[in-house]
Amino acid sequence: MGQILYQLDDNSLTFPLIECALTEPNGLLALGGDLSPERLIAAYSQGIFPWYSDNDPLMWWSPNPRAIIDIDQLRINRTLRKAINKSPYQITLNQDFSQVTQLCANAPFRTDGTWILPEMEAAYLTLHQQGYAHSIEVWYTDEHDNKALVGGLYGVAVNGFFSGESMFYKQSNASKFALIALGQLLKSVDINFIDCQLLNPFLEDMGAKETSRDIFIHKQQHALTKTMPDDFWQPRTLTVI
């Protein structure tokens, strides 16, 4: 395809075909638009996500290849299994979405500047309130009964498709526990993969791999046909096994 960068129409939710995304930078598809819930849901339903930094225009991406985790291949090595068996953590679903996004935005391991800007936090909070964005929280209670959020992740779900957005940790293995809990939760209703968008060393260590955009879209479109139980995303405590 020709290397054309599209400008979104503010009055339309239509995106260009994902095959039109640039090869350099990989996956950049369009500029502009807004972070309204309707546009975000339209984007995620087509395998497109926003990603930009402060002072940049709003940019929309659909990279090729795409990073995913096949849940059956989620990697739990012997050391991590021992940590799970002796876990001091409590893991919950959708109990503090706002704090998870704030801590992801300010995670100390970010070295290239945060991309979770205040307007993005607000947009995803609105999606959460509408039932499309969800969080996993990992809590630790110390010997003085002080409870703190020490790890977590959040992402966007449209029917059976879940796209992970960001995660953080303050204690060893906390973000791994969150990812495993998410995988086991999705697997319980026969959802077999998590969209990771872009590969990084942490995700690769947990079993993520890159796949072609065509294969990703095929898997995604199948996931979008799945109907979720009405109470699936209700706030509750989760157990990692």
UniProtKB/Swiss-Prot annotation:
Q: Please name the GO terms of the biological process aspect recorded for this protein, alphabetically.
A: protein catabolic process
Catalytic activity annotation: N-terminal L-lysyl-[protein] + L-leucyl-tRNA(Leu) = N-terminal L-leucyl-L-lysyl-[protein] + tRNA(Leu) + H(+); N-terminal L-arginyl-[protein] + L-leucyl-tRNA(Leu) = N-terminal L-leucyl-L-arginyl-[protein] + tRNA(Leu) + H(+); L-phenylalanyl-tRNA(Phe) + an N-terminal L-alpha-aminoacyl-[protein] = an N-terminal L-phenylalanyl-L-alpha-aminoacyl-[protein] + tRNA(Phe)
Q: Which UniProt keywords apply?
A: Acyltransferase, Cytoplasm, Transferase
Record's Pfam families?
A: Leu_Phe_trans
- State its Enzyme Commission number(s): 2.3.2.6
Per the record, its GO cellular-component terms are: cytoplasm
GO function terms (MF aspect): leucyl-tRNA--protein transferase activity
Q: Where in the cell is it found?
A: Cytoplasm
Q: Does the keyword Acyltransferase apply?
A: yes
| Domain of life of the source | Bacteria
What does it do? Functions in the N-end rule pathway of protein degradation where it conjugates Leu, Phe and, less efficiently, Met from aminoacyl-tRNAs to the N-termini of proteins containing an N-terminal arginine or lysine.
Say which family it is in: Belongs to the L/F-transferase family.
Name the NCBIfam families on file.
Answer: aat (TIGR00667)
Q: What is this protein called?
A: Leucyl/phenylalanyl-tRNA--protein transferase
